Regions:
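Surface-exposed acidic/polar loop and edge beta-strand patches at domain peripheries
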Residues: 4-134
Length: 134
């Protein structure tokens, strides 16, 4: 587990965890603003895994469902917080027409294609450059 911090304008960015998955580095970042609200995101599936916001009394509480560790997000988990794409929902018979062209997609839900196909965005490891976080 590695932990590094970087201040970007009004946010504190902390790399909380990092592990190797299929030859790539999967990382977990915590971003906290000056008011104390925090989110955690991972570059695996561009997933939002934690949000802490104040309640009516100003007490910060988690407000989204999440899994216990970064490792639990890998593979075919329930897609909690993941980015859906290149499309969401099912495409019947895994094909669609655009103009006069018929496009055939991966079948990953019986005869249909769902949530980006076999290797949708939720299963991608995205590159992270924290210099772009403002």
């Amino acid at each position: 587990m590695s932990c590094s911090q970087e201040r970007k304008s009004d946010f504190l960015i902390v790399k909380k965890d990092s592990l190797q998955y299929e030859g790539k580095s999967v990382e977990l970042f915590k971003i906290t603003n000056k008011q104390g609200m925090a989110i955690e995101v991972t570059n695996y599936g561009a997933s939002l895994v934690f949000v802490s916001a104040p309640d009516k009394n100003g007490v910060f509480e988690p407000v989204v469902l999440g899994l216990d560790s970064l490792r639990h997000y890998l593979g075919r988990q329930p897609k909690l917080g993941a980015t859906v794409g290149r499309f969401a929902n099912r495409i019947k018979d895994a094909e669609f027409s655009l103009g006069k062209t018929v496009y055939h997609l991966d079948k990953n839900s019986k005869a249909h294609s769902i949530h980006g196909g076999v290797k949708g965005f939720n299963l991608q490891v995205f590159d992270v450059d924290t210099s772009y976080i403002v």
